[in-house]
Amino acid sequence: MIRLGGLFPEHLNLNGDFGNLDVLKAQLEWRGLSCETVKIERASDLTSDLDFIFVGHGSVAAWSAIHLEFEALAPTLRLLLEGGTPGLAISTGFEELVRTNVFTGLEATTMATRTSKFEVYKDGDNEVLGYLNTDVNLPILHRERNWVASMLHGPILAKNPFLLEEVLGRITSYAGVQLPVIYESEKAGQLADLIDEVWKLEKELASE
């Protein structure tokens, strides 16, 4: 059983960020692998049998509400990261992992102006599509150990198949299983069509 953990889902899902966890679970199940999602709200929830950890995006008020709990579990998050547990962090989730030194070598500083736009970001030979809304100077995409972090909002994995495959590969490799192809070709085709439509719309917006 592959276990996918999500931190504070009631607080860190401002732009549908937990859609990333949903698409991972659906993809694993479509490929014939059993998995479950679990809620993480305290350090004791961060157990070694987790195969993936997700940190979403929240408002200032949301982060204020969970501030003490997040501070308490940050050292355990760092230990799991160092031990190879895969993860994904989105927008302010990324910022907080930098602030609490779960991610190292980065500094989150506030810029004079806020950037709010659809973004197509070049990542090697690939492009990453998403919406950027921040006044912090962190990189749009960052990888550390087995984690991926992005300043782009929302369900980034649903829009970017290569990034989805990368994260799925990290999860299954850590869990010690092979990543099969999707058995149900009709679902795979429908997903590809949906992604194409999203790319068409948002690339047009990004070029405006």
Question: Positions of the model-derived regions?
Answer:
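Pocket-forming structural segment of enzyme catalytic cores
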Residues: 99-148, 152-155
